[in-house]
Amino acid sequence: MSTFTRVMEEKIMPVAGKIAGQRHLSALRDGIILTMPLIIIGSVFLILTSLPIPGYADFMASVFGNEWADKLGYPVNASFDIMAMIAAFGIAYRLAESYGVDALSAGAISIAAFLLATPFEVPFTPHGSTESIMVGGGIPITLLGSKGLFVAMLIALFSTEIYRYIIQKNIVFKMPDGVPPAVSKSFVALIPGFIIVLLVWLARLLIEMTPFQSLHNVVGDLLGTPLSILGGSLGGSLIAEFVQMLLWSCGIHGASIIGGIMAPIWYGAMDANRLAFQAGEALPSIFTTQFFQIWINVGGSGATLALVLTMLVRSRSKQMKQLGRLGIGPALFNINEPIIFGMPIVMNPLLIVPFIIAPLLTITATYIGMSTGLVARPAGIAVPWTMPPLISGYLATGGKVSGAVMQLVNLLITCAIYYPFFRIWDHQKWREESAVESGDKNVM
């Protein structure tokens, strides 16, 4: 066993395994994923507002009127602007499910606690005035969307931990045996639900006595802003990608773990770009969820489409040629488990090097392209991660060819990175096959 393999197995894999199995991180990941169907549906309507087809705008105006773009925005806003509320339910549901307690009740209580922590005030600018005032009684849509994700996460984890503790301590109302199960479960949730609401209410009253005024401001200033700066920077993104690739190298789904941590940051950046795109303003963010899914991980984590193409074109080994044929179909849809585990890349010191380096270089190249204005930034459109390259880059930028061109550039970069390492691996496999065919098992 090589020193590298021994260090990976003895030092890194145990820690990575514990992180991967951590129930709270799993709940964050799986709970936030619950928002994706709605976001993708909203993104379809967002794409329809900006199709670069001659005569398209005139046709839409003739059908829906001059405000057709605003009308297409209705389902966009309805899906994006409840992101935090859906996440509050989903995270609580998944965490309660992992504890074996009633997940539906936990999710409902989490939503109530989240809304209780959210001030029902909206800014209003009176006619003829240049300054806005806060008016009570309105639902603050911005806080129910991406801006409220951090609070939704914390509330969901906090409320579910209290909920399961009280349930497991059996501090509940017990109904007679003849009561229907659905009714019985609802009464079981009464005491933990009351305690959670009471605690969140008291916390809100205390916070309102401070300059912060709301939990959203506390979390935004103390947690959200620093993390957003980190996740929205080149250095922070390189670190996140490096850790993700290192976890994959141990056979652990790095995207699930790092995605669960960084999702609220990158989702928030995505939504900020979406709002700017709808308003026709400059897009503020580069590092969003789509930045990594569309431009960095072309072919899957580690940008392995380049490796598969190299296998198809340059393999001497029969095993590598066959694996390339099997892997090209999934790779075009950004699915690369057959390559990661079949080649394998996992626990393979030779191939781990380009597997880690390739996405780090494409992050840097794409950042340079977007920051200089040569490449359009992601427009906040949630293109499915399984969308084939070139098409996905075009759609994710709101119909800009530069998005597809950047994907092609990244593919060429990653081909150049993988090629020398693959040649060594392919030659080794070819010699092993030659030894078997010649009957000389000692040939290396």
UniProtKB/Swiss-Prot annotation:
An annotated GO BP: phosphoenolpyruvate-dependent sugar phosphotransferase system
Quote the cellular component terms of the Gene Ontology held in the record.
plasma membrane
Coarsely, its chief localization is membrane
Q: Name one GO molecular function term.
A: protein-N(PI)-phosphohistidine-sugar phosphotransferase activity
Q: What subcellular compartments does it reside in?
A: Cell membrane
Q: Which domain of life is it from?
A: Bacteria
Give the keywords, sorted. Answer: Cell membrane, Membrane, Sugar transport, Transferase, Transmembrane, Transmembrane helix, Transport
Using the record's annotation, list all stretches that form the PTS EIIC type-3 domain.
Answer: 8-421
Instruction: Specify the protein's topology with respect to the membrane.
Output: Multi-pass membrane protein
What does the record give as the function of this protein? Answer: The phosphoenolpyruvate-dependent sugar phosphotransferase system (PTS), a major carbohydrate active -transport system, catalyzes the phosphorylation of incoming sugar substrates concomitant with their translocation across the cell membrane.
Entry's PANTHER family? LICHENAN PERMEASE IIC COMPONENT (PTHR33989:SF11), PTHR33989
Q: Please quote what the entry notes about the protein's domains.
A: The EIIC domain forms the PTS system translocation channel and contains the specific substrate-binding site.
Task: Please identify the protein, giving its name as recorded.
Answer: Putative permease IIC component YwbA
The organism encoding this protein is Bacillus subtilis (strain 168)
